[in-house]
Amino acid sequence: MAKDALIVKTTPLPQSRISFELEIPSETCKTCVNETISTISRSAKIPGFRLGKIPKQVLIQRIGITQLHASALEKIIDKSWQEALKIKSIEPLSEPELVDGFESLLAKFSPEKSLKVTLQTDVAPELKLKKSKGLSVEISKTKFDPKSIDEALEKSRNQFANIIPVTNRAAKLGDIAVVSFKGKYKDSGKEIDGGTSESMDLELEKNKMIPGFVEGIVKMKIGDTKTLNLKFPEDYSHEDSRGKEAIFEVNLKDLKEKELPELNDDFAKQSGNKESLKELKKDIEKQLKDNFEKTQKDIKIEALLDALTNELVTEIPKSMIDLEVRNNIEQTAQRFAQQGLDVKSTFTPELVKSLAESTRPQAEKNVQRNLALKALAEKENITIDKSEIDLKMKEYDDVISQSSKQIDIKKLTEVISNDLLKEKLIIWLEENSEVNEKTTKTSKATKTSKTTKATKTATKTTKTTKTTKTQNKKEKK
């Protein structure tokens, strides 16, 4: 090996990291120092000297040897790092980290001597599936509830209802109460954050707001003021309020009720642009059944992906999860921007930190799943042909030609390729796995506890003893 050649030694580390131990020859150090001096000389302004004509010693005296060495050292490390990656044919996933720190290296740096540097970086993890074929999962198979059709119709009636004033009676369940209220904690007397409103339309339905709030308004008359002694649920969305007793001063300002339209052909034309009520019901039934079947399929796919991920043996680098978290936050910011919100003022450092913490578990799960699917593709040699991508790309021809914005074709092709491969991998999983379907009978889902800041939904499910097995394997033709 030439005396002035870079010496590179690599050592694998946990969590898919690699340590690079570099020995950088003195010739490289000298060259980078001289190049740094030349670069600074071209832009430095010193009275009595022309640009680019400042003597070396004068320049060093002016900027200081430490500053010069710091600039040169950055160049030395970057140049040697890029060369080391080429020598070892390694593609890093993250920026390199100096083990000893820059200040420590700078303190012992001398252009006349070789320099030893240790850098660490994340690399693509090695993937192994303990098992890919014959995965077995159990899912709860819920039967379609025909009552959901009537519920959908009733919801539609409520949407098209006429709102009429009520003046001659007290409030009852089903009414729309216009209320003002002010809440405070019973123990401290402190006002509740989000617990005050000057005027709010509140549908008087059980389990809306915190327990007892709606019930306390029932039987009130317009103009009445009432004190409600309530307690926040232990699982309330805001941690500071959980389990605390509260006092609400409520005033009933106005009262309205819904006048529901009759279920007839006229209603079908008004609500769904259908000629008859029969046709409307048929359309609603189709939509609900389609959604139901999609949900059932999604449940099965989720179970299969979880099972596959459990077979994955790998060490996921932190940088992959960090990138997924960052992408999730950026997507959230884009949605905010599309809604017309000011992203800069909304996404404070505190909010970004909170989002990063709350989305990290799901981000880690997403990365694990993607790696499991990648491992499956490699193990079973599942690929996407160029013809498949081209065929799918044709579906976007009109969108591309009519778009006012420049579309990144390369990125679009990559997204389409990844989506097609994922679809093919999921189909393969369905065909080569066993799904045990446990039939369940589901009762009505009840919406509960709609507060000013959060809504919770509780669903009760009763299991039956019947169990069915289905083998998701296609017959070979």
Curated annotation (Swiss-Prot):
Region span, Disordered: 435-477
Subcellular location field: Cytoplasm
Gene Ontology terms describing biological process: 'de novo' cotranslational protein folding; cell division; chaperone-mediated protein folding; protein transport; protein unfolding
Entry superkingdom: Bacteria
Top-level enzyme category: isomerase
A cellular-component GO term for this protein: cytoplasm
Gene Ontology molecular-function annotations: peptidyl-prolyl cis-trans isomerase activity; protein folding chaperone; ribosome binding
Keyword flag Chloroplast: no
Pfam families in the cross-refs: FKBP_C, Trigger_C, Trigger_N
Catalysed reaction equations from the record: [protein]-peptidylproline (omega=180) = [protein]-peptidylproline (omega=0)
Keywords: Cell cycle, Cell division, Chaperone, Cytoplasm, Isomerase, Rotamase
Keyword Cell cycle: yes
InterPro entries per record: PPIase_dom_sf, PPIase_FKBP_dom, Trig_fac, Trigger_fac_C, Trigger_fac_C_sf, Trigger_fac_ribosome-bd_bac, Trigger_fac_ribosome-bd_sf, Trigger_fact/SurA_dom_sf
Domain PPIase FKBP-type: 174-261
Amino acid composition bias (Low complexity), ranges on this chain: 442-470
Record-listed E.C. numbers: 5.2.1.8
Main location: cytoplasm
The protein's role, per its UniProt record: Involved in protein export. Acts as a chaperone by maintaining the newly synthesized protein in an open conformation. Functions as a peptidyl-prolyl cis-trans isomerase.
Family according to the record: Belongs to the FKBP-type PPIase family. Tig subfamily.
Protein name in the entry: Trigger factor
